[in-house]
Protein backbone atom coordinates (compact mmCIF):
# COMPACT_ATOMS: atom_id res chain seq x y z
CA UNK A 1 0.00 0.00 0.00
CA UNK A 2 1.25 3.48 -0.91
CA UNK A 3 2.07 5.53 2.20
CA UNK A 4 1.23 9.23 1.84
CA UNK A 5 1.58 10.20 5.49
CA UNK A 6 2.25 13.84 4.60
CA UNK A 7 -0.97 14.22 2.59
CA UNK A 8 -4.49 14.79 3.91
CA UNK A 9 -7.25 13.57 1.59
CA UNK A 10 -10.18 16.00 1.64
CA UNK A 11 -13.70 16.36 0.33
CA UNK A 12 -15.34 19.73 1.03
CA UNK A 13 -19.08 19.47 0.46
CA UNK A 14 -22.57 19.55 1.90
CA UNK A 15 -24.25 17.93 -1.11
CA UNK A 16 -24.09 14.68 -3.11
CA UNK A 17 -22.75 12.96 0.00
CA UNK A 18 -22.92 9.42 -1.33
CA UNK A 19 -20.75 10.29 -4.31
CA UNK A 20 -18.16 12.16 -2.26
CA UNK A 21 -17.93 9.38 0.32
CA UNK A 22 -17.49 6.88 -2.50
CA UNK A 23 -14.72 9.04 -3.98
CA UNK A 24 -12.92 9.17 -0.62
CA UNK A 25 -13.13 5.40 -0.24
CA UNK A 26 -12.01 4.76 -3.82
CA UNK A 27 -9.01 7.01 -3.23
CA UNK A 28 -8.01 5.18 -0.05
CA UNK A 29 -8.31 1.66 -1.46
CA UNK A 30 -4.57 1.38 -2.15
CA UNK A 31 -3.25 4.43 -0.29
CA UNK A 32 -2.73 5.24 3.38
CA UNK A 33 -3.07 9.00 3.81
CA UNK A 34 -1.94 11.01 6.81
CA UNK A 35 -5.60 11.86 7.36
CA UNK A 36 -8.91 11.58 5.50
CA UNK A 37 -11.44 14.35 6.05
CA UNK A 38 -15.00 15.02 4.97
CA UNK A 39 -15.54 18.71 5.72
CA UNK A 40 -19.25 19.40 5.81
CA UNK A 41 -22.26 20.36 7.91
CA UNK A 42 -22.45 17.45 10.31
CA UNK A 43 -26.24 17.22 10.17
CA UNK A 44 -25.95 16.46 6.45
CA UNK A 45 -23.47 13.60 6.86
CA UNK A 46 -25.06 10.13 6.90
CA UNK A 47 -24.47 7.84 9.85
CA UNK A 48 -22.31 4.73 9.61
CA UNK A 49 -19.37 6.27 7.76
CA UNK A 50 -16.29 4.09 7.27
CA UNK A 51 -13.93 4.61 10.21
CA UNK A 52 -11.15 5.92 7.97
CA UNK A 53 -13.18 9.09 7.26
CA UNK A 54 -13.05 11.87 9.84
CA UNK A 55 -15.86 14.42 9.70
CA UNK A 56 -15.08 18.07 10.42
CA UNK A 57 -17.63 20.87 10.66
CA UNK A 58 -17.44 23.63 8.05
CA UNK A 59 -16.42 26.98 9.52
CA UNK A 60 -19.51 28.39 7.78
CA UNK A 61 -22.10 26.78 5.47
CA UNK A 62 -21.35 26.70 1.75
CA UNK A 63 -24.39 27.70 -0.30
CA UNK A 64 -22.92 28.51 -3.72
CA UNK A 65 -19.92 27.93 -5.96
CA UNK A 66 -18.60 31.35 -4.92
CA UNK A 67 -18.88 30.30 -1.25
CA UNK A 68 -16.89 27.16 -2.12
CA UNK A 69 -14.19 29.16 -3.91
CA UNK A 70 -13.90 31.64 -1.05
CA UNK A 71 -13.57 28.78 1.45
CA UNK A 72 -10.89 27.09 -0.63
CA UNK A 73 -8.80 30.25 -0.81
CA UNK A 74 -9.17 31.64 2.69
CA UNK A 75 -10.33 28.87 5.06
CA UNK A 76 -9.36 25.36 3.93
CA UNK A 77 -5.89 25.57 5.48
CA UNK A 78 -7.41 25.67 8.97
CA UNK A 79 -8.39 22.02 8.53
CA UNK A 80 -4.96 20.76 7.40
CA UNK A 81 -2.09 19.65 9.64
CA UNK A 82 0.01 17.71 7.10
CA UNK A 83 2.36 19.31 4.59
CA UNK A 84 -0.04 18.77 1.68
CA UNK A 85 -3.73 18.33 0.90
CA UNK A 86 -5.30 16.33 -1.92
CA UNK A 87 -8.75 17.78 -2.57
CA UNK A 88 -11.14 15.50 -4.46
CA UNK A 89 -14.78 15.57 -5.59
CA UNK A 90 -17.46 13.07 -6.47
CA UNK A 91 -16.49 13.50 -10.14
CA UNK A 92 -12.73 13.32 -9.61
CA UNK A 93 -10.50 11.15 -7.43
CA UNK A 94 -7.56 8.71 -7.43
CA UNK A 95 -7.65 6.19 -10.28
CA UNK A 96 -4.02 5.14 -10.72
CA UNK A 97 -2.02 4.97 -7.47
CA UNK A 98 0.98 3.57 -9.37
CA UNK A 99 1.35 6.95 -11.12
CA UNK A 100 2.27 8.62 -7.84
CA UNK A 101 5.77 10.05 -7.56
CA UNK A 102 7.22 11.93 -4.61
CA UNK A 103 8.21 14.59 -7.12
CA UNK A 104 4.63 15.85 -6.76
CA UNK A 105 5.43 16.89 -3.18
CA UNK A 106 8.12 19.24 -4.44
CA UNK A 107 5.38 21.59 -5.62
CA UNK A 108 2.91 23.76 -3.76
CA UNK A 109 0.17 23.38 -6.38
CA UNK A 110 -0.63 20.76 -9.00
CA UNK A 111 -3.86 20.39 -10.95
CA UNK A 112 -4.82 19.05 -14.36
CA UNK A 113 -3.41 21.24 -17.14
CA UNK A 114 -5.72 23.60 -18.96
CA UNK A 115 -5.63 23.68 -22.75
CA UNK A 116 -3.77 26.63 -24.22
CA UNK A 117 -6.26 29.29 -25.29
CA UNK A 118 -5.71 32.61 -27.02
CA UNK A 119 -8.11 34.46 -24.73
CA UNK A 120 -8.18 32.52 -21.46
CA UNK A 121 -6.01 31.87 -18.39
CA UNK A 122 -4.05 35.08 -18.96
CA UNK A 123 -2.48 36.64 -15.87
CA UNK A 124 -2.31 40.41 -15.21
CA UNK A 125 1.09 40.55 -16.90
CA UNK A 126 -0.14 38.98 -20.14
CA UNK A 127 1.25 35.49 -19.55
CA UNK A 128 -0.76 32.38 -20.40
CA UNK A 129 -1.08 30.04 -17.41
CA UNK A 130 -1.90 26.35 -17.83
CA UNK A 131 -1.72 24.81 -14.33
CA UNK A 132 -4.22 24.16 -13.33
CA UNK A 133 -7.63 22.77 -12.39
CA UNK A 134 -8.47 23.06 -8.70
CA UNK A 135 -11.35 20.59 -8.40
CA UNK A 136 -8.92 17.72 -7.88
CA UNK A 137 -5.57 19.14 -6.90
CA UNK A 138 -2.57 18.79 -4.60
CA UNK A 139 -1.75 21.85 -2.50
CA UNK A 140 0.81 22.53 0.17
CA UNK A 141 -0.04 23.92 3.59
CA UNK A 142 2.42 26.67 2.69
CA UNK A 143 0.20 27.74 -0.22
CA UNK A 144 -3.00 27.47 1.82
CA UNK A 145 -1.51 29.73 4.50
CA UNK A 146 -0.46 32.53 2.13
CA UNK A 147 -3.74 34.49 2.62
CA UNK A 148 -2.89 34.65 6.34
CA UNK A 149 0.35 36.48 5.51
CA UNK A 150 -0.52 38.81 2.64
CA UNK A 151 -3.67 40.20 1.12
CA UNK A 152 -5.01 37.96 -1.65
CA UNK A 153 -7.71 39.96 -3.45
CA UNK A 154 -11.04 38.21 -3.89
CA UNK A 155 -12.50 40.63 -6.44
CA UNK A 156 -10.26 40.23 -9.47
CA UNK A 157 -12.70 41.71 -11.97
CA UNK A 158 -12.24 45.40 -11.25
CA UNK A 159 -9.76 48.01 -12.42
CA UNK A 160 -6.97 47.97 -14.97
CA UNK A 161 -4.61 45.54 -13.24
CA UNK A 162 -6.90 42.54 -13.81
CA UNK A 163 -7.89 43.59 -17.32
CA UNK A 164 -7.01 40.16 -18.73
CA UNK A 165 -9.47 38.39 -16.43
CA UNK A 166 -12.85 36.89 -17.26
CA UNK A 167 -15.21 39.41 -15.65
CA UNK A 168 -17.72 37.96 -13.21
CA UNK A 169 -15.81 34.78 -12.43
CA UNK A 170 -14.54 34.08 -8.93
CA UNK A 171 -13.27 30.52 -9.45
CA UNK A 172 -10.70 29.71 -6.79
CA UNK A 173 -8.31 27.95 -9.14
CA UNK A 174 -8.30 30.97 -11.43
CA UNK A 175 -7.58 33.21 -8.46
CA UNK A 176 -4.68 31.11 -7.18
CA UNK A 177 -3.19 30.02 -10.51
CA UNK A 178 -3.87 32.99 -12.78
CA UNK A 179 -5.18 36.20 -11.22
CA UNK A 180 -3.01 36.24 -8.09
CA UNK A 181 -0.35 33.65 -8.90
CA UNK A 182 2.34 36.31 -8.61
CA UNK A 183 1.39 36.96 -4.98
CA UNK A 184 1.76 33.28 -4.10
CA UNK A 185 5.08 33.08 -5.95
CA UNK A 186 6.33 36.10 -4.01
CA UNK A 187 5.76 33.97 -0.89
CA UNK A 188 7.90 31.18 -2.36
CA UNK A 189 5.15 28.96 -3.74
CA UNK A 190 6.10 26.70 -6.64
CA UNK A 191 3.63 25.56 -9.30
CA UNK A 192 4.13 22.32 -11.19
CA UNK A 193 5.02 22.62 -14.88
CA UNK A 194 2.54 21.32 -17.44
CA UNK A 195 4.53 18.13 -18.01
CA UNK A 196 4.39 17.18 -14.33
CA UNK A 197 0.76 18.24 -13.97
CA UNK A 198 -0.16 15.98 -16.91
CA UNK A 199 1.21 12.99 -14.99
CA UNK A 200 -0.75 14.02 -11.91
CA UNK A 201 -4.26 14.64 -13.26
CA UNK A 202 -6.37 14.22 -16.39
CA UNK A 203 -9.27 16.47 -17.37
CA UNK A 204 -9.26 16.46 -21.18
CA UNK A 205 -7.10 15.19 -24.04
CA UNK A 206 -3.97 17.27 -24.49
CA UNK A 207 -0.68 16.67 -26.32
CA UNK A 208 1.08 16.52 -22.95
CA UNK A 209 -1.05 13.67 -21.56
CA UNK A 210 -1.24 11.46 -24.63
CA UNK A 211 -0.74 7.83 -23.59
CA UNK A 212 -0.68 8.63 -19.87
CA UNK A 213 -2.87 7.28 -17.08
CA UNK A 214 -2.43 9.94 -14.39
CA UNK A 215 -2.78 9.59 -10.63
CA UNK A 216 -6.18 11.34 -10.48
CA UNK A 217 -8.82 12.65 -12.87
CA UNK A 218 -11.41 15.43 -12.97
CA UNK A 219 -14.74 14.94 -14.76
CA UNK A 220 -13.45 12.77 -17.62
CA UNK A 221 -11.54 9.52 -17.21
CA UNK A 222 -8.33 9.18 -19.24
CA UNK A 223 -8.80 7.14 -22.44
CA UNK A 224 -7.00 4.12 -20.97
CA UNK A 225 -9.71 3.75 -18.30
CA UNK A 226 -12.83 4.32 -20.37
Where are these regions (language model features)?
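Catalytic core and acceptor-binding pocket of nucleotide-sugar-dependent glycosyltransferases
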Residues: 131-226
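Short glycine-/acidic-enriched loop or helix-start segments at secondary-structure transitions
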Residues: 21, 48-49, 96-99, 148
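Short His-Asn-centered micro-motif
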Residues: 12, 39-41, 88-89, 112-113, ...
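N-terminal anchoring/stem segment of glycosyltransferases
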Residues: 1-69, 73-84
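Conserved donor-nucleotide/metal-binding helix-loop-beta segment in metal-dependent transferases, i.e.
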Residues: 93-125
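Generic structural signal for small/hydrophobic residues in well-ordered secondary structure
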Residues: 36, 90-91, 140
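Short beta-strand-to-loop acidic/aromatic patch adjacent to the donor-nucleotide binding site
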Residues: 82-94
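Extracellular/periplasmic catalytic domains that process cell-envelope and extracellular macromolecules
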Residues: 2-4, 79-80, 103-104, 129-131, ...
Amino acid sequence: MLDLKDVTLVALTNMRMEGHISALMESTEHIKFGDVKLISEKDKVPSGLPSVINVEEMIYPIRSIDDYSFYMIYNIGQHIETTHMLIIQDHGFVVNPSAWTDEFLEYDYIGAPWAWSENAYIDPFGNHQRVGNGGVSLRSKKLMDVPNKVVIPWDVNQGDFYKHMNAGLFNEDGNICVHNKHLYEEQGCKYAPVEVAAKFSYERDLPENKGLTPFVFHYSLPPSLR
